[in-house]
Amino acid sequence: MGAAHSASEEVRELEGKTGFSSDQIEQLHRRFKQLSGDQPTIRKENFNNVPDLELNPIRSKIVRAFFDNRNLRKGSSGLADEINFEDFLTIMSYFRPIDTTLGEEQVELSRKEKLKFLFHMYDSDSDGRITLEEYRNVVEELLSGNPHIEKESARSIADGAMMEAASVCVGQMEPDQVYEGITFEDFLKIWQGIDIETKMHIRFLNMETIALCH
């Protein structure tokens, strides 16, 4: 009786922290146990057995995001060696559809949280800025599966996108002015008016039994 009460209290606490329902938490817990091999924590190598990740060109960045202390709200840099179920839920909550019944301020806060998660995937050195080199790395990874696009072409695409970002965020630049990279404030400007919902989903975890959209 006491154990059952304690478990339900824990679920309610997780509901409050992540926004998932008790049914969703139960289903995600089954998936967590499947990934971890029934262990209390997950390590990076546990993601090697996720079929939907195998062919994803930015697989390494997706997996890394699960262990990024910034996303886990445990610090401003560094990676965790392993994550527990609550950590797993924290990361999964970034992919949860925004509840549009919330107030405007809360909806905007949820959107910013999602964009911060994406920003961290680009900002690999945790310095608060996406440099040209970091952006090139992402574009090269994204296009690595396309045999018709050479590395130099991928770099040109990244360079062009960075120039466009500079024009959006800084405006007209002087000939000798150097754009040092995209800050999170810049990132918000770039994503203004873009539907973040269509860019972030959880199919890569192959959760065929889970319906996160109601």
Swiss-Prot record:
Keywords: Calcium, Cell membrane, Cell projection, Cytoplasm, Differentiation, Disulfide bond, Lipoprotein, Membrane, Metal-binding, Myristate, Nucleus, Protein kinase inhibitor, Protein transport, Transport. This is Calcineurin B homologous protein 3. It is found in: Nucleus; Cytoplasm; Membrane; Cell membrane. Expressed in embryonic, newborn and adult testis, but not in prepubertal testis. Expressed in the embryonic testis during testis determination but is not expressed at any time in the embryonic ovary. In embryonic testis, expression is restricted to the testis cords and is seen in both Sertoli cells and germ cells. Expression is excluded from the myoid cells which surround the cords. Expressed in the embryonic adrenal after the initial stages of differentiation. Expressed at a lower level in the embryonic brain, heart and lung but not in liver or gut. InterPro entries: CHP3, EF-hand-dom_pair, EF_Hand_1_Ca_BS, EF_hand_dom. SMART domains: EFh (SM00054). Its main location: nucleus. Residues 1-20 are annotated as: Disordered. Monomer. Homodimer; disulfide-linked. Interacts with SLC9A1/NHE1; the interaction enables an optimal Na(+)/H(+) exchange activity. The gene is Tesc. One of its GO terms (biological process) is positive regulation of DNA-templated transcription.
